[in-house]
Amino acid sequence: MTWNFGDILDTIIPVLPQGHLALVHGAREITWQEMDQRSNNLGRYMLDNGANFGDKVGFYMRNRPEYMETLAACFRARLTHVNVNYRYVADEVHYIFDNSDASVVVYGKEFRDNVEILRPRLPKVKLWIEVGDGADLPADSLDYETLTSIGTGENLDVERDGDDLLFLYTGGTTGMPKGVMWGHTALRETQTMALRALGDVPETLDELKAHLQTNGPGEVYIPACPLMHGTGLFTAMAAMMNGGTIVTLQAASLDSDELWRTVESRGVQNIAIVGDAFAKPMLAALEQNPGGYDLSSLVSMISSGVMWSMEVKQAMLEHMPQVMLADSFGSSEAVGFGSSITTKDAPVSTAKFTTNDFCKVFDENDNEIPRGSETPGFIAFGGPVPHGYYKDEEKTAKTFKTIGGVRYSIPGDYCLVAEDGTLTLLGRGSVCINSAGEKIYPEEVEEALKLHDSVEDALVVGVPDEKWGQAVTAVVKVAEGAEFDDKSLQLFVREKLAGYKSPKHVFAGGPPFRAPNGKADYKSVTEFAVQEVAKRA
């Protein structure tokens, strides 16, 4: 069976109840019938005005209804979603849109200044569509609301394919961000894999239609984490493809009180987060206002992308004992490595995951590591996987390997595999830093630091941090005759890169940075940085 998300939408929308909500943002409500027409109109406009099947559409927005509407329009018009981190500075955004060959960009009005910088540098972009109030619209931009209202709202007369693509750009572990190319069928299969273990799952469009007619529309979800990252996007997509309701929060960053108030007012059943970086402030709000929120509607919380500690899970369950906490182990390149389910009566250790038959653990020579071995290895997923990285055959070959006739995705996560198949995650085998779910490439920060007159050399590492998971930490060699000022270096990096890439700590001195061959000694520098951070604690 092949799947296409555009075909799924065309199939399920006619059987959803009139007035059933598709998208909610504060007081704003968009029904499924409204979203149906608006997304069809937008998709048709893009096709009629320069976009062709398979063209890339850049999404430059925070969490808001227009993100999911535009996604639906892309699915229906056979256009390819391209995410961009809205925290990026202009040069970083330019790289994503240029590398992806975007021909359309849909952006929030708040990012207009960056768009005006980028516009002359991106001649391949044919349509710039602004999401906002329509006021003072730049001459070369189109108003989103106007485009969604132009047309009859009828379904597009297009024949779709199971290999239509969705791009998910990831910071990765080395080099610049890479565009992971997911086919619709493979991505849909990742949504249904886990459900098959729980019972019958619709395996065809007709079965999906009958399922919704019998059981009614899907549940109410809050993607509390950004839609421009995989956890938020894939969770919201799963809700959408089951006729559910997607509620986006209004605050620009996590506001735990708003989140819990929204759960209460909207009867939210499921929340998606990114580990302790979200869970800890959410827990703090519960503890500051015990019994102050009605969370009786809540059924589950899912997390992926960064550690969600057992202690925080247990504390959260004291406030909502009926909720199932699902910790998913995956990456942009592989969804469904494993999971751990925590309930009030069944706690699970931090970073331990139950895996499935698609997963194997291999050593550096592609030999399978047997269960129960104390030897760490790389986790590999042999189920539905992406086609590879866009325009990067070399990195595709390194990450997506065929071993024993099976094509595996091997993003680089180290783990131990127990006798029962349980995985204990040890972390990335590379030097990539994961700070609150954001992947940070050290060399990029190092290069920014070395542009400063006072820095002769620099290495950047991740230091364990209670709040962030890992804190970006720089160790620099001060140039002869220069003065060391950690605050000025932090500000300097902020001017060059997105704020979350700026070091939380900067130290001077330490061990020799490099071996005689010039290779960076990240191990020694990390040990030094950990010691220095501890001194400040």
Where is each model-derived feature located?
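Gly/Ser/Thr-rich phosphate-binding loop
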Residues: 241-244, 268-273, 283-347, 358-360, ...
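Conserved AMP-binding/adenylation subdomain of ANL enzymes
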Residues: 189-224, 228-272, 285
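Conserved beta-loop-beta connector loops within the AMP-binding
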Residues: 360-380, 419-420, 482-486, 520-521
